[in-house]
Amino acid sequence: MLLDPLRRALQRQGFRAVNWHYRSLRGSIETHAAALTAKARALDEAPDVERLHFVGHSMGAIVVRSALALSRPRKLGRVVLLAPPNRGARLADLALRLFGPRIAAARELCSQPDSYVNRLAPAADLDCGIIAAAWDHAVSLASTHLPGERDHIILRSLHTLPLHRHAPAQVGQFLREGRFQHASG
């Protein structure tokens, strides 16, 4: 899957990384968030888990935000969102125009003011870093920002940010230090 190389790279950096999979076109974001909350609760109660960080890509970033709005783990660490459609996604807008409201993800992730993603609380109290893709045709740079974000960086990438060669180092840097490594000069 798309996040497997990132998971392996984070493991090489010393993180105990676990991929949690869901079917993006089946079920609502709230349904996925409830399932993620249950998984997070189990990890939060595990005695060998010191910190519980979250990394989400695209719709998965919104699932993470929604799950953390439902319940905050006691051991919550940092959150990294890659190409998050925090204010809606161009691709969802297009899907909504082409297919109508039949696709839940398109309804929930579109840029309309009353869409799920635009009603979701910004979670300004999260220790959250955001990585945006410079050439993302699904999510605009402006839509990636979130009030209260700790740091924001743009990588020269398409929407497939988890596969970018610098993404694992940037994610690890933020999880450890609470900031990204910005290019000097």
Which residues fall in each region the model found?
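C-terminal catalytic-base region of ester-bond hydrolases, centering on the histidine
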Residues: A121-G185
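Serine-dependent carboxylesterase/thioesterase catalytic core
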Residues: M1, P5-R23, G27-D125, A138
